[in-house]
Amino acid sequence: MSLDERIITQAILETYFEKFKSSLDLDVAIVGGGPSGMTAARLLAADGFNVALFERKLSLGGGMWGGGMTFNMIVVQEESVHLLTDVGVPVKRYKDNYFTADAVAATTTLASAACLAGAKIFNCMSVEDVMLREENGVKRVTGIVINSSPVEIAGLHVDPVVLGSKYLVEATGHAVEVLQTLVRKNDVRLNTPSGGIEGEQSMWADTAEINTVKNTREIFPGLYVAGMAANASYGSYRMGPIFGGMLLSGEKVAADIAAKLKG
């Protein structure tokens, strides 16, 4: 049977917009496709929730691809190993509490597992703002404002569109881009000591890994922080090419949001 290029185009258009239309009212929107975002997306989707992940770049993975300084191996600690092995990533013990995995295998498998669990992935999609509603004087995040990344990169004056979500996960890493926009544009106070973004400190892997999980929480009504964004929001340290805290943060934010959605 000969191929018709028009049908190829039609297939892409119809199936993509079916996926897009099913994301108009999400249970959870996740911004950022690093290890914490991918883990959260997989677990929430596997739990039956309507979940979509938005990644500005063409590929998912955040900083995981390059390991340390482009030496593409990563390290995780023992308590997080299950979040790799559960999806089929081979892990090797290096020393007590130090396990290694191939960075490319880990990244691609985490991304695939999220998709296969039912999470919808929108790459090349930038989240430029949030949607807010106010009830009884309390503001709450109720959705995301999105645009095509090429539009953003080219600096074109093109209006975005909006998707609703019951909860939003800020997992954009060091830059905390969603929170930066929320704070800059609105008279709001975050659930932090100062009421603002505390800022990331320098390298201290042990404390950073502990705090990545500890700081994973609802920082503003309807908005959670996870991964490195959690530490940047609450003023903790960076950790470098050890990824256990990121994975555990994704697991924690998924569990916390699932508990709220189940009511």
UniProtKB/Swiss-Prot annotation:
It holds the Pfam family Thi4. InterPro entries: FAD/NAD-bd_sf, Thi4_fam, Thi4_prok. It comes from the Bacteria. NAD(+) binds at residues 36, 55-56, 63, 127, 157-159, 228. Signal peptide: none annotated. It catalyses: hydrogen sulfide + glycine + NAD(+) = ADP-5-ethyl-4-methylthiazole-2-carboxylate + nicotinamide + 3 H2O + H(+). Fe cation binds at residues 159, 174. GO terms for biological process: thiamine biosynthetic process; thiamine diphosphate biosynthetic process; thiazole biosynthetic process. It is an enzyme of class 2 (transferase). Keywords: Iron, Metal-binding, NAD, Thiamine biosynthesis, Transferase. Its cofactor is Fe(2+). The keyword Cytoplasm does not apply. Belongs to the THI4 family. Homooctamer; tetramer of dimers. HAMAP family: Thi4. Involved in the biosynthesis of the thiazole moiety of thiamine. Catalyzes the conversion of NAD and glycine to adenosine diphosphate 5-(2-hydroxyethyl)-4-methylthiazole-2-carboxylate (ADT), an adenylated thiazole intermediate, using free sulfide as a source of sulfur. This is Thiamine thiazole synthase.
